[in-house]
Amino acid sequence: MSGGGGASAGDVSRETRERIEALVSRETLSRLEAFAALILRWTARINLVSRKDAAPAEIWNRHILDSLQMLPLVPQGAFRAADLGSGGGLPGLVLAIARPEIGFTLIESDRRKAAFLQTAIAELKLNATVLPVRIEQARLEPSPLVTARALAALPVLFGYAAPLLAPGGVCLFLKGRGADAELTAAAEGWQMRAERFPSQTDAGAAILRISELRRAA
């Protein structure tokens, strides 16, 4: 990583730096730096991230690394994926930068955030499109991969994801400390295979890999 201020990631901890460099190439890192700079510039106007997370080091650790840690769980190959409630492009645009062969559809109903996403896609020349509608209004071909971060409780999230998920596909959801309780609640209405992977950025959080998702009989 380059040094210096701004959004270059020069202020992150050594541990965060090493984790990011282990996941992406130097070229990808350069594009992530450009993306982080866009987040900083736009956050002053439309609150893409909370104010306490608006410092460069926090953007890299709490948002970019948080999204990048999903990479080892992303299926291989070229396909289209759906990112639900994309907000500031986390994780959708981060994954689009790291896996350019995957075409991401970013579903975001907030017009200002959708405008940010469209700007980032154009400036960074990403393989992604923005669908500025509510998730339940989205009309897409089912995808092998559906992603989301800090969007809704799992019983609701499964309702959003199921119509957009292709047979044999997987969901990757970044969840906070209530993930286990949410899985228990979701099991009342859904059948699934759920795998839990510990977060690298929050000791109590997790990445959930959901497959074989269907409504309970």
Curated annotation (Swiss-Prot):
Q: Which UniProt keywords apply?
A: Cytoplasm, Methyltransferase, rRNA processing, S-adenosyl-L-methionine, Transferase
Domain of life of the organism encoding this protein: Bacteria
The keyword rRNA-binding is annotated on this UniProt entry: no
Which one Pfam family would you cite for this protein?
A: GidB
UniProt subcellular location: Cytoplasm
Give me the disulphide-bonded residues: none
Q: What's the main place this protein lives?
A: cytoplasm
Q: Which GO terms describe its molecular function?
A: rRNA (guanine-N7-)-methyltransferase activity
- Indicate yes or no for the key word Amino-acid biosynthesis: no
Give the enzyme's EC designation. Answer: 2.1.1.170
Q: Which GO terms describe its cellular component?
A: cytosol
- Reactions it catalyzes: guanosine(527) in 16S rRNA + S-adenosyl-L-methionine = N(7)-methylguanosine(527) in 16S rRNA + S-adenosyl-L-homocysteine
Q: Which Gene3D superfamilies match?
A: Vaccinia Virus protein VP39 (3.40.50.150)
- Please tell me where S-adenosyl-L-methionine binds in this chain: G85, L90, I135, E136, R149
> What family does the Swiss-Prot or TrEMBL record give for this protein?
Belongs to the methyltransferase superfamily. RNA methyltransferase RsmG family.
What does the protein in this record do?
Specifically methylates the N7 position of guanine in position 527 of 16S rRNA.
The name this protein carries in UniProt is Ribosomal RNA small subunit methyltransferase G
